[in-house]
């Protein structure tokens, strides 16, 4: 509804880069944005931060008919999606990914979660967002390191999908917009077949068993994209050794 309130979740760096533009766009259409600040990266995926977000939504008078927007990388989308699923037993959420990693993978498929002391992503639900909107101009603000992290997830999807996507991720001068499109289409098809991650969708966890262990035992000093890259290499070497 054009008069609904919008909770905009993002960290300070993302807010400084993109927040003003998003708020201006919302206000021009008579929406009423209310920014809820988050810690950057994996640090936002805790019970404490989740509780603070839920309490802020209540204090600001948000209802089930209002909207939550998660602006940022995969961690922000994970946290924002779970908060939206829990508040009033479900308010609509839109993801505005700002990283390649979130654009090719994390923002697609409906998985939400926070971390527990026992491991990564142990508490969450699967609930699809109202929409995922990626502004390709965000690519211009990403470091080469951030692009490489996103490509780790894209390579994973390329291994599974094969065909054109595999060609794209092996191009020494990757066309990121096309890679994102192919990743999104493939993952959406997989999720449509197995939304609750019981069978076919499990393949999308390729490299993540090792990757998540690396993240956790490094205290999340090793970021998700780097951990997935290591996980993929580890599984590939193990498979070669086993003759697969």
What are these regions (language model features)?
Residues 1-67:
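ATP/NTP phosphate-donor binding region
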Residues 8, 46, 97, 135, ...:
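Residue-level signal for inorganic ion chemistry
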Residues 9, 37, 70-72, 95, ...:
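Short beta-strand segments
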Residues 71-73, 97, 223-227:
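Active-site nucleophile and cofactor-binding loops and adjacent substrate-binding regions
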